[in-house]
């Protein structure tokens, strides 16, 4: 019984620190220093939330840039089901899945001449990736130009405008946020 009191008081102390003080402190500091990020990096148009800059969306029409495939297949880009497909490189199911994605991309992009960028046929680890490389976006230009009656030059400039360089030049690669790019594409039609 002598050891019960210190154990109980340590438990209560740690419960208050880890369950109360720490979450409250991180929430307050996050709201103070990074309010946009702490609230989900929501992209708004007026009072309407159009998406998040952190989570991809399922753009399926020919007039939109398509992102990486979502690993949450039943409900694409569902953050509650986030996670990879867990298929090993040696798994024949992964080969079938990639072959089906390649066939679908070839059918939707018959005018694209180069080989399909790998990120358009492989899901990210989270299954919610919102970024692709500018090269993967450029690969889709012929389909979008045809569907929206836009010039290749207009779409190339749009990709360049929304491309983000890595923080450190030699670590990482440039990326394009698909949600922001497609919202900008919609604004061209207005």
Swiss-Prot record:
Transmembrane portions of the chain: 10-30
Keywords: ATP-binding, Cell inner membrane, Cell membrane, Ion transport, Membrane, Nucleotide-binding, Potassium, Potassium transport, Transmembrane, Transmembrane helix, Transport
Localization (cell): Cell inner membrane
Main location: membrane
GO cellular component: plasma membrane
Keyword Cell membrane: yes
Cell inner membrane keyword on record: yes
InterPro entries: KdpC
Recorded topology in the membrane: Single-pass membrane protein
Example of a GO MF term: P-type potassium transmembrane transporter activity
Pfam families linked: KdpC
Protein family (similarity comment): Belongs to the KdpC family.
Functional description taken from the UniProt entry: Part of the high-affinity ATP-driven potassium transport (or Kdp) system, which catalyzes the hydrolysis of ATP coupled with the electrogenic transport of potassium into the cytoplasm. This subunit acts as a catalytic chaperone that increases the ATP-binding affinity of the ATP-hydrolyzing subunit KdpB by the formation of a transient KdpB/KdpC/ATP ternary complex.
Subunit structure: The system is composed of three essential subunits: KdpA, KdpB and KdpC.
UniProt xrefs under PANTHER family: POTASSIUM-TRANSPORTING ATPASE C CHAIN, POTASSIUM-TRANSPORTING ATPASE KDPC SUBUNIT
Protein name listed in UniProt: Potassium-transporting ATPase KdpC subunit
Protein's organism: Escherichia coli (strain 55989 / EAEC)
Gene: kdpC
């Amino acid at each position: 019984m002598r050891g019960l009191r210190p154990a109980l008081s340590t438990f209560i102390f740690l419960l208050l620190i880890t369950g109360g003080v720490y979450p409250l402190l991180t929430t307050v500091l996050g709201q103070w220093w990074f309010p946009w990020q702490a609230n989900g990096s929501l992209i708004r148009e007026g009072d309407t939330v159009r998406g998040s800059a952190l989570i991809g969306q399922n753009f399926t029409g020919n007039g939109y840039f398509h992102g990486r495939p979502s690993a949450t297949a039943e409900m694409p880009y569902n953050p509650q089901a986030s996670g990879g497909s867990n298929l090993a490189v040696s798994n024949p199911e992964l080969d079938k899945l990639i072959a089906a994605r390649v066939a679908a991309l070839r059918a939707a992009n018959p005018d694209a001449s180069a080989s399909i960028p790998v990120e358009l046929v492989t899901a990210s680890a989270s299954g919610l990736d919102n970024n692709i490389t500018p090269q993967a976006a450029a690969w889709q230009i012929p389909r979008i130009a045809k569907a929206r009656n836009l010039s290749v030059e207009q779409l190339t400039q749009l990709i360049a405008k929304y491309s983000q360089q890595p923080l450190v030049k030699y670590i990482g690669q440039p990326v394009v946020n698909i949600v922001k790019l497609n919202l900008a594409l919609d604004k061209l039609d207005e």
